[in-house]
């Protein structure tokens, strides 16, 4: 139900993002690659303090070194790669801080299999997790999504409704308000179709070396676009 509600509430914002992408060929405006501003050391320490346990995905707060594992009632997670990013990107009046990026191998508990079957038929899989903070620096309400699209070096592209965390980071943000949370996307997953086995095997041999995030456009309370979507590339 949460996924359905997210789709309904956020449809207008995605339409704006898609429209912006289609007009990119006509002019040099639209999506831009933004320059990051590094955070202070104190801000970096806040990344785990801001974390809120998720009802679908295994807690990864203790995973700081490649090879470390953690198990809970939602499954078993193994850390495959990690990048402390701690950079802030400005999208008009919105500040998006990417705090941390992880590549995690997850074997969900049996009780969670049905949830993940919407996205993959694999019993275990890798996913890229991005921990972000998003802040509205203006006094007026805006609508924005920190990740409307995500692309990897392997050629896969995901839109926002493939997010496995569902922490309601997309949508309205009141003036001066701030949200923190996770977004995660299953990568190199098998399709579940026999004729795609060769392609699935090839994808699994590819390492995730970088991701490219495209935010949504920023809209005001009347759903009028006030800032263009931005592209952010992050390497492991």
Swiss-Prot record:
Signal peptide start-end: 1-23
Annotated keywords: Signal
Disordered, as annotated region: 22-62
Compositional bias per record (Basic and acidic residues), positions renumbered to this chain: 24-35
Protein's UniProt keywords contain Signal: yes
Origin: domain of life: Bacteria
Any matching Pfam family: DUF4352
Listed name of the protein: Uncharacterized protein YdhF
Natural source organism: Bacillus subtilis (strain 168)
Phylogenetic placement of the source organism: Bacteria, Bacillati, Bacillota, Bacilli, Bacillales
Chain's gene name: ydhF
């Amino acid at each position: 139900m949460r996924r359905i509600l997210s789709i309904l509430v956020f449809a207008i914002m995605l339409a704006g993002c898609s429209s912006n992408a289609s007009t990119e060929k006509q002019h040099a405006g639209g999506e831009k690659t933004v320059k990051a501003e590094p955070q202070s050391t104190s801000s970096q320490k806040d990344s785990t303090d801001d974390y809120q346990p998720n009802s679908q995905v295994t807690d990864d707060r203790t995973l700081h070194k490649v090879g470390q594992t953690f198990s809970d009632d939602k499954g078993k997670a193994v850390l495959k790669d990690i990048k402390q990013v701690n950079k802030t990107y400005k999208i008009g009046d919105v500040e998006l801080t990417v705090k941390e990026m992880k590549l995690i191998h997850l074997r969900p508990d049996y009780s969670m299999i049905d949830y993940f079957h919407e996205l993959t038929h694999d019993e275990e899989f890798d996913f890229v997790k991005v921990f972000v903070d998003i802040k509205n620096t203006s006094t007026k309400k805006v609508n924005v999504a920190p990740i409307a699209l995500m692309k990897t070096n392997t050629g896969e592209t995901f839109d926002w409704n493939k997010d496995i965390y569902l922490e309601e980071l997309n949508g309205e943000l009141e003036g001066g308000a701030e949200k923190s949370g996770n977004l995660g996307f299953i990568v190199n997953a098998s399709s579940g179709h026999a004729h795609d086995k060769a392609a699935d095997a090839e994808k699994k041999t590819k390492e995730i070396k970088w991701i490219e995030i495209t935010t949504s456009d920023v809209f005001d309370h009347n759903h009028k676009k006030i800032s263009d979507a931005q592209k952010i590339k992050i390497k492991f």
